[in-house]
Amino acid sequence: MESQQLHQNPHSQHGSAYASVTSKEVPSNQDPLAVSASNLPEFDRDSTKVNSQEETTPGTSAVPENHHHVSPQPASVPPPQNGQYQQHGMMTPNKAMASNWAHYQQPSMMTCSHYQTSPAYYQPDPHYPLPQYIPPLSTSSPDPIDSQDQHSEVPQAKTKVRNNVLPPHTLTSEENFSTWVKFYIRFLKNSNLGDIIPNDQGEIKRQMTYEEHAYIYNTFQAFAPFHLLPTWVKQILEINYSDILTVLCKSVSKMQTNNQELKDWIALANLEYNGSTSADTFEITVSTIIQRLKENNINVSDRLACQLILKGLSGDFKYLRNQYRTKTNMKLSQLFAEIQLIYDENKIMNLNKPSQYKQHSEYKNVSRTSPNTTNTKVTTRNYHRTNSSKPRAAKAHNIATSSKFSRVNSDHINESTVSSQYLSDDNELSLRPATERI
């Protein structure tokens, strides 16, 4: 009889289960399974509703109302300590200053429906149940900075976040992530959060607060859909769902790598060599550029490298262009060997040039001072040298020599006069002297 009654009333099971959670006692003389939900008194149904609401566990108010199923609640788990947050750390609430954008730390302010199905982000809707393995941000966790140095002071933000900052555009594809992250970093800098963004070396100026962490996390997930992120970004977030700083740090590093690739291509295309530096230095410079490009999955063939090098050769190395013009199989090592050979030959010639010049100069000096020289050009120049060009000492010497010569001539004339007079006296001849002394 009872089985037939249950079969006829399919809702009787639900009614009995619904009544079992109430605080209303069922009379012991009546089988509770035999009483259908429709036969309960009106006050019993009201008390059942009230008591079922009172016995609801704390925390289920955030879950959408469901009378037939109660969602499991997430366990209280401290924030993840893996990833880069062991190094960077976050400030405790007593260190964090009162933020003017505190409402941005509420996930409900950044509602985005397509993130509700992604396991790598904690859900932006506070009414959505969180998975057990994704803990939310908690301000009661121990600060790793306090465990190291309790008296250390961390710089805090002193400016307010601007309210009229232009938000970044939404990421549209995985290939555009490198471009999108530039706009996102600019967005954070315009929001006065540039001092917590890692630089090229992965260093930051100060530690971020919990409010700033939530602000960065929520804005990142709002404008970057998870299914459009690159694989390396997904791998980071799967290890630590909130480690946005590591993503930004590696993004900056990749941007620097891309800039370095461009610089290397420009340097390789503008190579110049004229022998002013050693051939070894030139070879090391070119090889370093080619190796750096190879590490970034950019292979430079020997033929292309030889063509770029030959284009920049000048001076004594220029003739190598004609030598390699007809070659089809160019080897970079062979080209470097020939450049080294020319450089060594020029170096030997430059070392011999000063000694040859010195010997030639000494030969010229000897020919000028030798008395037996046959250089008519030197003799003519010295013979016609005027007294006006002589130095003052030479002029005085010439004057003294000329006066001495005149005195010698006058003495000779006097002696001849006396001898002539003596001859005339002996021969008794009267002769007229040739000269008279004045």
Curated annotation (Swiss-Prot):
It comes from the Eukaryota. Residues 369-381 have a biased composition (Low complexity). The record marks 397-398 as: Cleavage. GO terms for cellular component: cytoplasm. The keyword RNA-binding applies. Keywords: Cytoplasm, RNA-binding, Transposable element. The keyword Cytoplasm applies. Residues 1-89, 366-438 are annotated as: Disordered. Residues 1-39, 49-60, 399-408, 415-424 have a biased composition (Polar residues). It is found in: Cytoplasm. Pfam families: TYA (PF01021). One of its GO terms (biological process) is viral translational frameshifting. InterPro entries: TYA (IPR015820). Transmembrane segments: none annotated. Residues 295-397 are annotated as: RNA-binding. GO terms for molecular function: RNA binding. Capsid protein (CA) is the structural component of the virus-like particle (VLP), forming the shell that encapsulates the retrotransposons dimeric RNA genome. The particles are assembled from trimer-clustered units and there are holes in the capsid shells that allow for the diffusion of macromolecules. CA also has nucleocapsid-like chaperone activity, promoting primer tRNA(i)-Met annealing to the multipartite primer-binding site (PBS), dimerization of Ty2 RNA and initiation of reverse transcription. Homotrimer. The C-terminal RNA-binding region of CA is sufficient for all its nucleocapsid-like chaperone activities. Retrotransposons are mobile genetic entities that are able to replicate via an RNA intermediate and a reverse transcription step. In contrast to retroviruses, retrotransposons are non-infectious, lack an envelope and remain intracellular. Ty2 retrotransposons belong to the copia elements (pseudoviridae). This is Transposon Ty2-DR2 Gag polyprotein.
